[in-house]
Regions:
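Hydrophobic beta-strand anchors of alpha/beta hydrolase catalytic cores
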Residues: 18-19, 50, 100
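Thiol/disulfide oxidoreductase modules built on the thioredoxin-like
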Residues: 68-72, 79-125
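Active-site acidic short loop of glycosyltransferases
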Residues: 13-15, 45, 71, 94
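Short pre-active-site segment immediately N-terminal to redox-active cysteine/selenocysteine motifs
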Residues: 14-17, 22-25, 57, 96
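Structural microenvironment flanking redox-active thiols in thiol-disulfide oxidoreductases
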Residues: 31-70, 81-89
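Active-site-proximal beta-strand/loop segments in catalytic clefts of secreted hydrolases
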Residues: 21-23, 53-56, 79-81, 112-114
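C-type cytochrome heme c attachment motif
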Residues: 24-31, 99
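A short beta-strand-turn-helix
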Residues: 1-17, 86
Length: 127
């Protein structure tokens, strides 16, 4: 990651994490932000981290995250050069955003729209 805009760097090689690709200009992405904040709150005591990743520049993402405040209460990072995005989205043939990946111990165990069955996928990964 080029920049960790909100929160500390996360090591996804251990535990359960949600890696979600989004953009400030994307209305469905903005709609899913409060839902992801709710999920982060719901699962934080079980060690789950939500990581929102954008490939936009710091000058675009940072003010957006600041304006969102507590409505966007999870880790946010910038993927300059799209290497992380290509590693996830490209591998699974996904082009559209928002798109979330549930990662358990470094391996993707589910992927889909963050508003569709994400909680069930997290619950399964935590078993």
């Amino acid at each position: 990651m080029a920049h960790w805009v909100k929160g500390n760097p996360v090591d996804i090689s251990n535990g359960v994490h949600v890696v979600e690709f989004w953009a400030t200009w994307c209305p469905p992405c903005r709609t899913s932000i409060p839902h992801l904040t709710q999920i982060q709150q719901q699962y934080k005591d079980r060690g789950v981290n939500i990581i929102g990743i954008s490939n936009e520049d710091l000058g675009t993402v940072e003010p957006f995250v600041t304006r969102m405040g507590s409505k966007m209460n999870y880790t946010v990072a910038i993927d300059e050069g799209r290497s992380t995005s290509k590693g996830y989205m490209g591998k699974y043939g996904v082009n559209g955003i928002p798109h979330a990946f549930v990662v358990k111990d470094g391996a993707v165990v589910w992927h889909g729209h963050p508003m569709a069955k994400l909680e069930a996928a997290i619950d399964d990964a935590l078993k």
